[in-house]
Amino acid sequence: MMKLLYSAEAIAARVNDLGDTLNRQYKEHKTVHTVVTMNGASIFAADLVRRITAPQVLHYTGGSYFKGAIKQEVAMNPETLPSNFNQAPVLVIEDILDSGNAIRQLRHILAERGAGPITVVSLFKRIGSPSVAEHSAFSLPRELFVVGYGLDMDGRYRELPAIYTFENTVMTGQSGQC
């Protein structure tokens, strides 16, 4: 049985807050390159980019972390990114920050390709995870598996307007934890 974790209204309020923060940050910039890292970030990204008033160029790396509730290795496609950002600012939009490895790897790629200031914003940051994002909408316990608002389980539940967890369901990884 699914249990509501964050309502659509709570999510919208946080997206608005993050949009306001990013608008102050990017108010002087002509163009911001926005990189959406994970498939699960798609709805969060769609709502957030519409709140940002600076002109943006959108890029998608199309990564994915999970098969069902089991953590897998991340697979991103950096070939979708420009070869040179010409020192333009880059906004990275992530769904859930776990280990931070994918973001560290992406920051390295972006820096090699001439990115200006890099800002990472995530929908969730797992409690106890390394701080690799400048902004996160919500915190999430390490063992909790969530769906909705773009996040899925085996391709299902992405379309839900709120974020839910399943009662008595926890994530598992290769070592039994995230």
Label every PLM stretch briefly:
Residues 1-178:
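PRPP-associated nucleotide enzymes
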